[in-house]
Curated annotation (Swiss-Prot):
Protein name per the record: 2-isopropylmalate synthase
Reported function: Catalyzes the condensation of the acetyl group of acetyl-CoA with 3-methyl-2-oxobutanoate (2-ketoisovalerate) to form 3-carboxy-3-hydroxy-4-methylpentanoate (2-isopropylmalate).
Subunit relationships: Homodimer.
Keywords linked to the UniProt accession: Amino-acid biosynthesis, Branched-chain amino acid biosynthesis, Cytoplasm, Leucine biosynthesis, Manganese, Metal-binding, Transferase
Length: 511
């Protein structure tokens, strides 16, 4: 059996379906570049038929990425296949991932199609996709609740039609490892021509077993795993890329395969996705959580000090953890700044953008004695928080908060280029800031989440604020970073408002 495990990352498609995690084209490009640096085999860049914006983002990634295959999702219909084919056309290596539901409940209630019609649609889609690329993947949506005989039949037919990868998804996160492994093994044994394709698995985490189910599939013959950075995804999320990769690498004696992932890029990838999407990583998250390599117990600490392998099965530095390394200071020049951005995988598209970023860096260096890698990531992201059709932008603000007095906030911001002033009172400086903004913009949005995370250590560290707003069924995340938490909060709120006013709205299907 092949000892190479292919990593199919769907952070930019399935991961983006997390509430409020929608990304701009530039944000998707930043993540795609990092995924390429990480060494993923396939980047599912989006769902081209969802919107012109999604198709444009996929096309931009296809033009940029050269060491990973760029993929677009497509339902099994002509419109979706044509949209996907056009979007991946510039790619050095492009893939179309087409799918159709195969479970009785989906065929009857959603598709309103007979099994014969479903097979016919799947075969037709694969053949049409082959007109754009030889690399076609087929997924049987809700395979976990599909009849085995029907799965064998439809997989047989799409392989004959030219599919190169067969993906078996647990769309609703219903299976358990023993049963999922058995299903994968049985399909590989029963489907004619199974040795001519790569078998893949795509597991959701509704019962907390996405990684375990994926690994069970690998142990039973799957050689592609579909996953996301930090396990990001709709509902309870997807299988975590970092956990899949390190489980297979650490226990190669069990799995008998490995990936081409550069594990030292795992933590940087995790931090970038967290920053852009506004989804913080829980401290006890395996591999990428802040406590993943922390030892509190005295017995554990003593053992680790004597010999690290007594309590550590992998090294923190192997997955990209390092101390907050001092990188630049207030005396650092423009060339040093540009070089450091390049080392971090940050690409600015013009000299004007570089000059603007350097100006923000010098401003930060005046407020903060030591500048770390994480500060630079946040600095560039803070500017990247501007949406493609930015309406609101903070110019200045003043907050008054005294013991025994009601906090007050005054802000100056632009609204479609026109300068506006706002003032308000609240139970605290952040509450006063948000009420001041609402007194002018009147969005009527509900505040679902407000969170603050320190970017680095120290009392002068930048704070990164995430705000989640809901309006008329839309949910968006806004982010802002600053050494002043209240300023960061105002930036985050305005960023969320900009997203609500943006016309970028997509609906991605489940797989």
């Amino acid at each position: 059996m092949n000892d190479r495990l292919f990593i199919f990352d769907t952070t930019l498609r399935d991961g983006e379906q997390s509430p409020g995690a929608s990304m701009t084209k530039d944000e998707k490009l930043r993540i795609a570049r990092q995924l390429e640096k990480l060494g993923v085999d396939v980047i599912e860049a989006g769902f081209a038929a969802a919107s012109p914006g999604d198709a444009d983002a996929i096309r931009a990634i296809a033009e940029t990425v050269r060491n990973s295959t760029v993929c677009s999702l497509a339902r099994a219909n002509e419109r979706d296949i044509h949209a996907a084919g056009g979007a991946i056309k510039p790619a050095k290596s492009g893939r179309i991932h087409t799918f159709i539901a195969t479970s009785p409940i989906h065929m009857e209630k959603k598709l309103r199609m007979q099994p014969d019609q479903v097979v016919e649609a799947a075969v037709k889609a694969v053949k049409l996709a082959r007109e754009y690329t030889d690399d076609v993947e087929f997924s049987a949506e809700d395979a976990v609740r599909s009849d085995m005989d029907f799965l064998v039949r439809i997989f047989d037919e799409v392989i004959k039609a030219g599919a190169k990868t067969i993906n078996v998804p647990d769309t609703v996160g219903y299976s358990i490892p023993a049963l999922w492994g058995e299903r994968m093994k049985a399909l590989i044994e029963r489907v004619p021509g199974s040795d001519k394709v790569i078998w893949s698995t795509h597991c959701h985490n509704d019962l907390g077993m996405a990684v375990a189910n994926s690994l069970a599939a690998v142990m039973n013959g799957a050689r592609q795993v579909e996953c996301t950075i930090n396990g990001l995804g709709e509902r309870a999320g997807n299988a975590s890329l970092e956990e899949i990769v390190m489980a297979v690498r650490t226990r190669r004696d069990v799995f008998g395969c490995d990936t081409r992932i550069d594990a030292t890029q795992i933590v940087p990838s995790s931090k970038l996705v967290s920053t852009i999407t506004g989804y913080p990583v829980q401290p006890n998250k395996a591999i990428v959580g802040a406590n993943a390599f922390a030892h509190e117990s005295g017995i554990h600490q003593d053992g680790v000090l004597k010999h690290r392998e007594t309590y550590e099965i992998m090294r923190a530095e192997d997955v990209g953890w390092n101390a907050n390394r001092l990188t630049l200071g207030k005396l650092s020049g423009r060339n040093a700044f540009k070089t450091k951005l390049a080392e971090l995988g940050i690409v600015l598209d013009s000299e004007e953008a570089l000059n603007a970023a350097f100006a923000r860096f010098k401003d930060l260096a005046d407020k903060k004695r030591e500048i770390f890698d994480e500060d630079l990531q946040a600095l560039v992201s803070d500017e990247g928080y501007a949406t493609e059709d930015e309406r609101f932008k903070l110019l200045s603000m003043k907050v008054c908060s005294e013991t025994g007095e009601v906090p007050r906030a005054q802000l100056v911001f632009t609204d479609d280029g026109a300068e506006k002033q706002a003032s308000g009172e609240g139970s605290g400086p952040v509450d006063a800031t948000f009420k001041a903004l609402e007194s002018v913009v009147h969005s009527g949005a509900d505040l679902l989440l407000y969170s603050v995370n320190n970017i680095t250590s120290g009392t002068d560290a930048q704070g990164e604020v995430t705000v989640r707003l809901a309006q008329d069924g839309r949910v968006v995340n806004g982010q802002g970073a600053d050494t002043d938490i209240v300023v960061a909060s105002a930036k985050a709120y305005l960023h969320a408002l900009n997203k609500l006013h943006s016309k970028r709205e997509r609906a991605h299907p489940q797989v």
